[in-house]
Amino acid sequence: MHVVVPFDGRDPKTRLAPVLDAPERRDFARAMLADVAETIESISFEPTILATTDVECEWPVVVDERSLDAAVNDQLAVADGPVAVVMADLALVTPDALDRLFRAGGEVVLAPGRGGGTNAFVARHHDFRVDYHDASITDHRSIAEEIGADTVEVDSFRLASDVDEPDDLAEVLLHGEGRAAAWLREHGFDLSMDEGRVSVQR
């Protein structure tokens, strides 16, 4: 199975700007990328980083400057077998969570994200294509139905938890065990309780 990890190497994670400056966002994004890629390796698959610009890392990199949809759909179109796509900001991902995704039956296997996104999927049907705009999980369900694909969804807290907003950093500190969590702690982030709600402070 070809495993693809899309990554914005230019200006990643802009919604974290209230708490991280641009160089910090790049460093933190690369820490999350490493967590995801190493987790994929740990279950005996090799990740291919699908990046918007060249990225120095220990994994194969394919540079595609086009939109996320165009870049991923090209990977799907040229594949001669199953393709898995796992987003680079799944800082809580574990080998067990990915193994569940990869082993699940179905021609299309979807891992919904919080807020309506699609954080990972496996496509075993050659006609499946992506549309990541807006609530993409509903679009991907519809696309799978239109091509007649047998579709399975994997309900996983760790696959559903992507890191886009400052509030998401609390989940990384609470549940993360990899480089991203370590990076936050090394840069002065810790948990804070505010009226019973967990957040982060620096």
Swiss-Prot record:
Pathway: Cofactor biosynthesis; coenzyme F420 biosynthesis. GO terms for biological process: F420-0 metabolic process. InterPro entries: CofC (IPR002835), Nucleotide-diphossugar_trans (IPR029044). One of its GO terms (molecular function) is phospholactate guanylyltransferase activity. The keyword Nucleotide-binding applies. The keyword Nucleotidyltransferase applies. It comes from the Archaea. Guanylyltransferase that catalyzes the activation of (2S)-2-phospholactate (2-PL) as (2S)-lactyl-2-diphospho-5'-guanosine, via the condensation of 2-PL with GTP. It is involved in the biosynthesis of coenzyme F420, a hydride carrier cofactor. HAMAP family: CofC. Belongs to the CofC family. This is 2-phospho-L-lactate guanylyltransferase. It comes from Halorhabdus utahensis (strain DSM 12940 / JCM 11049 / AX-2). The gene is cofC.
